Amino acid sequence: MNKTRVRNIWTGLLVLVLAGPVLADEGLWLFNMPPAEILKAKYNFVPSPEWLDHLRLSSIRFGGASGSFVSPDGLALTNHHVGQGAIQRLSTPERDLMKTGFYARTRAEELKVPGLELSVLQSIEDVTARIKGVERPEMTAAEAAEARDREIAALEEEESEKTGLRCAVVNLFSGGMYHLYRYKIITDVRLVFAPDYLIAFFGGDQDNFTYPRYDLDICLFRLYENDRPYPTPHYLKWNTSGQKEGDLVVVSGHPGSTGRLLTVSQLAFLRDVAYPWTLANYERRRAGLQYFSKRGGEAARNARGPLFGIENSLKAVTGYQSGLLDPVLMEIKLKEETALREAVRRDPEIDKLYGAAWDEIAAAQKTYAEIYKMYRYFEGGAGFTTSYFSTARTLVRLAAEKPKPDAERLREYRDVSLPAITRRLTAETPVFNDLEVFNLTDSLIQLQKEFGSLPEVKWLFAGRLAEDVAKDLISGTKLGDPAVRKAYLEGGLQAVSLSVDPMIKLAWLVDPLSRGVRKRYEQEVESVETRNGALIAQAVFKLKGTAVAPDATGTLRLSFGAVKGYVEN
């Protein structure tokens, strides 16, 4: 392949924003395990290590979404809907950037976004042998999970201290592989350009997740380091000539999650338990936010972002569920699983090692169905939908977890995560109390319907209406003040345990119950899925080889496809 063609491939992320349709090939591939043979056979292209490094270092993780460097001085391109939270954060009643759009004519006019951090993946290392090496045959699934968690915590801490980077172990193939990802974190991020909301989201929710779509869903930020634009030789250059039919295009990004490797019992759990609850929750919340928006003015402006998020998620999960409700698709999955299980049974040695894995996972789904609602309402926070409760829980759990050895903490409170937690808690971000009361009231109503007989819920309500409880909690808390949050951070366990803030008291009240259902989930569901998912992955590797892409995990992946025309109906 000539240099011009490779250069065009490098610009694929940009081209995809504006160009014609690309039919993606199967698989979201790891940067350190690209499908070289497939690319060679189908496109006569083999990505070199230098090519992969360039694309990886040109790619940016925007929270749970994706972007890319587009200049040598830190300019970054992403979607408007990805940057929407930052744009909303920078807006005021007098300066609604969602309504007017924004353009910085000079770097001095660029707007720094409080609390936003972006990351660039510096390297990947296969650490499967170390992580799985702590497992012992006599261990239960829960004991093996605890051993792996301790080893993961130790490795992440070692590597973070050694490199100065944020290091995270990523679980692939349901526990079949573990890779260490090392990230450079940039916390000085400034808005450069954003179109107004009507252009960026033209067509509204009706056009969302459809093709073709006609809107300008882009925005530009600039990353800074030491108050200077972040210098990088790795960025995607604009391709003014575009692509032609048949050209290979490569997309680099952070797909959230996929379920190609889930078992039939796991898919059935999603179809019958998780997605029906999730869809009902989203539909109710969407209707509520639409009603709240009718107040007009600031209410409509403040609800715009949350409403978009709910509508976006609702449409996505509706699509997932429609696939699971399709008997033809489910029959295909059942036949695939049956064929794999039969292949395992034909080899007594493989069957002895892996044959029971599917039944173990199926049993875990029954347990998950029993605890699902309690897990979502308490550990998932669905019963306390307000940013104040999220803040209070973080303070309470951080205070309780920090005195423990790193490996014994809840995984989200390990040392590697503490800088990000501190930045988030001390950032000055707007909170809209009317909207917080509205959301909390709605969630408390549902909590009381489902779990009104629990002592914790009875104590919380004390004979009051949900709206009165919400108003008392929101009006009484001081957690909207970053100085107060900082004082709790610095005061540690003593300050947080002695707090009379009603939101912190609520977080303490429900924490034992939340931890209990979380522990049951981790020991009886998650650990079982991980152990047996890894066994199924190993069976697949033995029977089919390793030329398989793992499911998406929110980490950086590659996707390939060719530009094709189509007939519009």
Regions inferred by a protein language model and the residue ranges of each:
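Bacterial N-terminal signal peptides
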Residues: 10-21
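Terminal presequence/propeptide segments associated with secretion/organelle targeting
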Residues: 20-569
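Bacterial N-terminal signal peptides that target proteins for export
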Residues: 2-10
